Amino acid sequence: MTARQIQLGDITFANDRPFALLGGVNVLEDLDFALRCAGHYKQVCERLGIPLVFKASYDKANRSSIHSFRGPGLEAGLQILQAVKDTLGIPVITDVHSPEEAKAAAKVADIIQLPAFLARQTDLVRAMAETGAVINIKKPQFLSPEQIRNIVDKFRECGNEQLLICERGTNFGYDNLVVDMLGFGVMKRTCDDLPLIFDVTHALQCRDPGGAASGGRRSQVVDLAKAGMAVGLAGLFLEAHPDPNQARCDGPSALPLDQLEPFLTQVKAIDDLVKSQPMININ
């Protein structure tokens, strides 16, 4: 099977090409924070030769508690993302939570993301598809790798073929996620070898059964990222923070920002090795 390619400016997403990074922060806090984090990502990725799309959310609409920080909102958040693009000259990705937001988000974001918890919402899929933007489809935690094909088909039937598919872990009993490495190949085969992204930081989430926020296992981010890269990915999805313990959302899963360069150096070495080898197809 020939790997499908999705083009975003100078970035080519394909499972047999050098990986791209969808990297950034979980949620926008303010403009200075966004520029500081995005600037660091840009410097590191330029040194390592890794294509970058900066990720940040303007609204975390699915927080566990009504009191949790959600972000600056659609209008202010998109202004911050536009400032990041204009100042640093890098593409951006953000997630969309309602059909009404899709068109506005796609005017700023180069990639718009379908959240895992909302991935079966047909009205949202249709609205996102109709923007014509590149779409990153998060596989829901509650679906098998094969079932993501149904979401892909919805987008295609709505006229959008500019699709990335993203693994972010699967429910394992209550309050825990695991990543099934066999599922990567299943997703590729089921979806005609669309570019596959691995969301390594959200896959590290775990919950306190009585808590109102997600916990995480960021100490294992290197292990999980290396394992994922070994199967041949089009991209890695990563969230980092200058001080994860003070992050407004998902700090327990976030990579410390000062560890970004050594982390990506090791991840890139594995990707380079994997992509330098001939593909072995076993039926």
Curated annotation (Swiss-Prot):
E.C. numbers: 2.5.1.55
One Gene Ontology CC term in the entry: cytoplasm
Assigned keywords, A-Z: Cytoplasm, Lipopolysaccharide biosynthesis, Transferase
Molecular-function GO terms, alphabetical: 3-deoxy-8-phosphooctulonate synthase activity
Nuclease recorded as keyword: no
Coiled-coil blocks: none
Pfam family membership, one: DAHP_synth_1
Family: Belongs to the KdsA family.
Protein name, UniProt field: 2-dehydro-3-deoxyphosphooctonate aldolase
Phylogenetic lineage: Bacteria, Bacillati, Cyanobacteriota, Cyanophyceae, Synechococcales
